[in-house]
Amino acid sequence: MANIRKKHPVLKIINHSFIDLPAPSNISSWWNFGSLLGMCLILQIITGLFLAMHYTADTTTAFSSVTHICRDVNYGWMIRYLHANGASMFFMCQFLHVGRGLYYGSYTYLETWNICVILLFATMATAFMGYVLPWGQMSFWGATVITNLLSAIPYIGTDLVEWIWGGFSVDKATLTRFSAFHFIHSFIITALVNVHLLFLHETGSNNPLGINSDADKIPFHPYYTIKDILGVVGLLAVLSSLVLFAPDLLGDPDNYTPANPLNTPPHIKPEWYFLFANAILRSIPNKLAGVLALVMSILILTLVPFLHTSKQRSMTCRPISQCLFWILVADLLTLTWIGGQPVEHPFIIIGRVASVLYFTIIIIFMPLAGWLENYLMNW
């Protein structure tokens, strides 16, 4: 059996990636989120496939088809809520995965890190299109508001928006193409994940100390497969509890009202995992500047490797950088809270301060902290 997995053309790839892969002996539970993301992706593809069998991408029947799935299809309600809450788990794991990369300096693997940022954009686009499909009030108005942001692009903005809509407003053509793109995007994400793993296995995993671990490596199986299985069981327990006891906890009540272009909801807001970006967008009065800030809130991650000034890779032994990192986490939580609040005083000013702080910490304070820590080490 050992010879087959080491010599068979297909099994050999699996063996080198998940069985005999040399891994640092000291990686902690923060390294579990990669496998959890893989499990979430598989779950999303399977549940999405079953939902696609019953869903109809038509403005007159989309809302009814989702109701039909929940009421008439065997375990349709569970499939629907596994898919919806699975997306929340996906983003939770993704944010923690990126946060771990920032804390332990994994961004120094440039190709792996840049693919990670592209994956973040791809999953956000996929989730946005998926949010439109139930064709509730928040689906319709969310699609209208977010796609309309592209009109801020000079010269081609208006034409681009109408091209995406397939008409002069969000309608049947928009829903049909969003449904098609949402379905195909999951496979694009799968391809990007494979590229991400390819680059990761070229360099090997980072570790909490941020040092070269070639002298002390262990095989991935059985040590880390068992560790990952524990993480998967934990995540499934949380997801199951959410689906079975509070399936609508992370959703919006407005989405249980069919889309009505003549009735605007008092407060249009996206899903919780977009709220931080929504807060940054709203904090800037100018439309084009707001859109640029929205894009830069994610794209700024590509600059992090070039802003690294410390002689140490990881923040494990860098107390000043640790403080800044946790201030950044608190700032992102504040932005998430602000993104879900109405646009009024004092939320406007809090959002602006938090948005400025977000960019300032990453662009100015983090590099300065690195230089200061280098100086203190030589002092």
From Swiss-Prot:
Superkingdom to which the source organism belongs: Eukaryota
Major localization class: mitochondrion
Keyword Membrane set for record: yes
Cellular localization per UniProt: Mitochondrion inner membrane
The entry's keywords: Electron transport, Heme, Iron, Membrane, Metal-binding, Mitochondrion, Mitochondrion inner membrane, Respiratory chain, Transmembrane, Transmembrane helix, Transport, Ubiquinone
TM helices/strands, residue ranges: 33-53, 77-98, 113-133, 178-198, 226-246, 288-308, 320-340, 347-367
Cofactor: heme b
Membrane topology: Multi-pass membrane protein
Cofactor binding remark: Binds 2 heme b groups non-covalently.
Signal sequence, start to end: none
Gene Ontology, cellular component aspect: mitochondrial inner membrane; respiratory chain complex III
Function: Component of the ubiquinol-cytochrome c reductase complex (complex III or cytochrome b-c1 complex) that is part of the mitochondrial respiratory chain. The b-c1 complex mediates electron transfer from ubiquinol to cytochrome c. Contributes to the generation of a proton gradient across the mitochondrial membrane that is then used for ATP synthesis.
Name assigned to this protein: Cytochrome b
